[in-house]
Amino acid sequence: YKRQILITVTSILSGCNSTSDEEIISSQDFKENYEVSSYGTEEKINTLSDVELTSSEKEYSDLENAKFFLENNSNKEYHYSKAYFEIEAEQSETWYQLTQLYDPSKDNEDDAVINSTERLSLPFDISSVYGELPSGHYRIIVSISYFESPKDWDYDTYYLACEFTLK
């Protein structure tokens, strides 16, 4: 009987120590829990001089107010996903790829077009895809593609990043 009580108490106590997938990410955990970003090393970012990803502010108190824009000042049209984006966190001058709670493009991989000289608002729901983020320095990354010959699927992909701080 004592053994059953001990096992029950141990189970209850260990359950109190378990973590949830949606818990707040701790900034101290970046190096231990996340991969170092391939953007900027294997994958080049912000290589287009006339297409950029910008934000309405450089600092946000919460992610609900974060607004990002895709600006095409070129004479070309580019394709992008309305749903897919990545968030990375910087710690000790190293960028880490944060883990998505789910792939936002899984249910809706709409291919969208940004025309020449167009500026579009990108309504990304960062909290839904990444959960609550601690204060820190981040960047959002999107990919765009230029189709040289759409019928042949001849295209080039470019990665755009915009840094921001979460207070």
State where each predicted segment sits.
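Primarily secretory-pathway and cell-envelope proteins
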Residues: S20-Y102, S143-K167
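Conserved small/polar residues in nucleotide/adenosyl-binding loops
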Residues: Y1-Q4
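C-terminal motif of bacterial Sec signal peptides marking the signal peptidase cleavage site
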Residues: I12-G15
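Short, solvent-exposed, Trp/other aromatic-anchored flexible loops in extracytoplasmic proteins
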Residues: L101-S149
